[in-house]
Amino acid sequence: MADFKLSTSIRYDPILLDAPKHEDLDTTDWNRKVASPWYMLDYHRDRMLKAATHFGWKSAVEKIEGLEGLKRLEDFLTPFTRSAGLKPHRVKILLDEDGTLKHEFSPAQQTSLNNMFPSYLPAPEEAKEAAVNISARATPGKLPEYEIYVDSAATSHTEFTHYKTTKRQMYDDARKRLHLALADPKEVLLVNPTDGSIMEGSFTTPFFWRNNRWVTPPVSQGFQEGNGSGGNEGTTRRWALERGLAIEEKVMARSLQNGEECWISNGVRGFIFGRIKI
């Protein structure tokens, strides 16, 4: 048995039950077709399936592949929905090599459907005149505002930065260097040691404003050593790229400016506004 588990952290939130009623929201197929309290469950399944396939975990693949696998994952989570009540939660799903599923949970902050499924990411204040005028209805809120720092050390690109697993020491170390607690409204950006580009956040995907558009560090399709920024194939990252909210582009750590506006996202909190702190 491997000494790690595959993981993905998903949002449980009863307000998602209303998502299919909101025609202005461009959700995933899961949240469009199913009245479900689970945020992008289909994308969370897909990321675990890719990881299980990469590591050659046949039993884990069989557990969650196909429509039957997605249903098994939903059924596994159903007992939690009966006991969680109306408050949002962060639920970490763990998948073992033998196909065993487990979960851990904790309370999550309130957020809106607009921050889970934004029609666009608002341009920075200084760039509004240059940006394309977008009359979107699902505008994400900018509160709470996160402080975004750049790690002082580099982090190696490995299969454990590409795929989300319980091997997270590199992310914990990055937060420790800045003395960041998990509850702090703060994030730290990891830096690729090869070229000094931004890889990802310790628990989020970052988006930066470059040439009048939002960009996010490139990630290879499947783990390829030396290709891409070295970051994770996140669920909200995938969603944003598929809908044209951002494109992939390398962003050098040295290009970031103090006070620069940015967005970060993940599968628990949706899209969050932030500012770079140098």
Predicted regions and their residues:
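Helix-start/capping segments and mature chain N-termini
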Residues: 1-80, 87-90, 95-278
